[in-house]
C-alpha cells in the first residue's frame, strides 16, 4: 500500500490508446495510485510529452521495462502490450506477488494450441496460462474475484458475447446459425500509423476486413462453447467505420422456439443481467447507439424478433476503449480487490 493507503498500480505499454485510457481511469480511482508507467519506445520521456493534455495530472516518466523494479513498486500491473509480449512478463510478475491484468490476447484461451493457431506464437507458459481467468465480469464474476491473472477480453468479443450469452446459456437458439455483424471505430486499430486508418482513407467509407478469419472469432467461439456446453462455431464479420471510438454488434440467430416474442426475450435478458450494473437492457422497440456508450463502461442492448424468419436480432453498443478494453480491466480489478465493480468507472457518456 502507498503512504495514502492506496493500492500502487503500474502500466506496461502506457503509450497506446489502451494505456492512456487506463491512466485516465486510474488517476480518478479513489483506491488506486499510479506508481509506474513503462514502455521501451518512449522510455525516459515524460508521459505528458506523449499526451500533453495530461499536464498537471500525471508527472511520471515512461520507464524501461524492469520486472524487478515494477514488482517492488506495484501490487497490480496492467499489461497493455501487443499480442505475444505478455507471456514473457506475466510469469515473473506473478511470482513476485503482483496481480496481473493482460489486455492482449495472450491469456484469453483455455487451449494454448488455439492461441498458437491464430496468433502464431508457440507457448512455454502452460502452467501460468492455466491459472488465467477470462475477464468478462458478467459471466465469470466469482472466478475473477479469486484470480491473480486476468485475460481481459477483446473489444469485439465483449460486445458480441454480451449480446449472445443469454441465448447460448439458456439454449434459446440454434447455435450454429449465429451470425455477428460488428462495426468498430478506428481507435480499435491502435495508435500506430496505418494507411487504412488515415483520415483521407477512412472518412466517408465503410468496409469489412479479415472476413472469415478475424482473430477474435475463436475467442467468441470458446466462450459460446462454454455457455452452450458443447462446441459452437459462429460467423463473425468486423467492419471499420469512420469514427474514433465505439462498437455496434448486431447478432442474428434462429430461435429454437419460433413462438418466442420480443417481450419474452426482454424478460430473459433483464433476469440474466439483473446483477450486472454495466449492462443496460433497453425498452421494447429501442435500439442502442454507440454515442450513448461513448466514454463509459456501459453496454447497451436492444432486442428484436422477426417472426417472419424465426430469428432473434440482438444489438449491443459499447465504447471499444472502455467496456471493450481498459474500463473492463478496471472493473475486473475492482472485483479482485473486493470493491464495488462500479468504483472509479464513468457512467455518463460524452454527449452529443
UniProtKB/Swiss-Prot annotation:
Metabolic or biological pathway: Amino-acid biosynthesis; L-arginine biosynthesis; N(2)-acetyl-L-ornithine from L-glutamate: step 3/4
Catalysed conversion reaction: N-acetyl-L-glutamate 5-semialdehyde + phosphate + NADP(+) = N-acetyl-L-glutamyl 5-phosphate + NADPH + H(+)
PROSITE patterns: ARGC
An individual GO BP term: L-arginine biosynthetic process
CDD domains: AGPR_1_C (cd23934), AGPR_1_N (cd17895)
GO MF term set: N-acetyl-gamma-glutamyl-phosphate reductase activity; NAD binding; NADP+ binding
GO CC term, one of those recorded: cytoplasm
Residues at the catalytic site: 155
Principal subcellular localization: cytoplasm
Pfam families listed in its UniProt record: Semialdhyde_dh, Semialdhyde_dhC_1
EC top class, as a word: oxidoreductase
EC number: 1.2.1.38
Function: Catalyzes the NADPH-dependent reduction of N-acetyl-5-glutamyl phosphate to yield N-acetyl-L-glutamate 5-semialdehyde.
Family from the record: Belongs to the NAGSA dehydrogenase family. Type 1 subfamily.
Record-given protein name: N-acetyl-gamma-glutamyl-phosphate reductase
Amino acid at each position: 500500500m502507498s503512504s495514502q493507503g492506496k493500492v500502487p498500480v503500474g502500466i506496461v505499454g502506457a503509450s497506446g490508446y489502451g494505456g492512456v485510457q487506463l491512466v485516465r481511469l486510474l488517476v480518478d480511482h479513489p483506491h488506486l495510485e499510479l506508481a509506474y508507467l513503462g514502455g521501451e519506445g518512449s522510455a525516459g520521456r515524460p508521459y505528458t510529452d506523449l499526451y500533453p493534455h495530461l499536464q498537471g495530472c500525471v508527472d511520471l516518466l515512461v520507464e524501461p521495462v524492469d520486472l524487478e523494479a515494477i514488482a517492488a513498486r506495484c501490487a497490480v500491473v496492467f499489461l497493455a502490450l501487443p499480442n505475444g509480449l505478455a507471456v514473457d512478463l506475466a510469469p515473473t510478475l506473478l511470482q513476485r506477488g503482483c496481480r496481473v491484468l493482460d489486455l492482449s490476447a495472450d491469456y484469453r484461451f483455455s487451449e494454448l494450441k488455439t492461441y498458437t493457431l491464430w496468433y502464431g506464437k508457440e507457448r512455454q507458459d502452460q502452467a501460468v496460462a492455466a491459472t488465467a481467468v477470462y475477464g468478462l465480469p458478467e459471466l465469470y464474476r466469482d472466478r475473477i474475484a479469486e484470480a491473480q491473472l486476468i485475460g481481459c477480453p477483446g473489444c469485439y468479443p465483449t460486445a458480441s458475447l454480451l449480446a449472445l450469452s443469454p441465448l447460448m446459456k439458456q439454449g434459446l437458439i440454434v447455435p450454429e446459425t449465429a451470425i455477428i455483424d460488428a462495426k468498430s471505430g478506428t481507435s480499435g486499430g491502435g495508435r500506430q500509423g496505418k494507411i487504412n486508418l488515415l483520415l483521407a482513407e477512412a472518412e466517408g467509407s465503410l468496409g469489412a476486413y479479415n472476413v472469415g478469419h478475424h482473430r477474435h472469432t475463436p475467442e467468441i467461439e470458446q466462450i459460446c462453447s462454454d455457455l452452450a456446453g458443447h462446441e459452437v462455431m459462429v460467423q463473425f464479420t468486423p467492419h471499420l467505420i469512420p469514427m474514433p471510438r465505439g462498437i455496434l454488434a448486431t447478432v442474428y440467430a434462429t430461435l429454437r422456439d419460433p413462438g418466442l416474442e420480443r417481450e419474452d426475450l426482454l424478460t430473459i435478458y433483464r433476469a440474466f443481467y439483473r446483477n450486472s450494473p454495466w449492462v443496460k437492457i433497453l425498452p421494447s422497440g429501442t435500439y442502442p447507439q454507440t454515442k450513448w456508450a461513448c466514454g463509459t463502461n456501459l453496454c447497451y442492448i436492444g432486442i428484436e424478433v422477426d417472426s417472419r424468419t424465426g430469428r432473434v436480432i440482438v444489438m449491443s453498443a459499447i465504447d471499444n476503449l472502455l467496456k471493450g478494453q481498459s474500463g473492463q480491466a478496471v472493473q475486473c480489478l475492482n472485483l479482485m480487490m473486493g470493491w464495488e465493480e462500479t468504483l472509479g468507472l464513468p457512467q455518463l457518456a460524452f454527449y452529443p
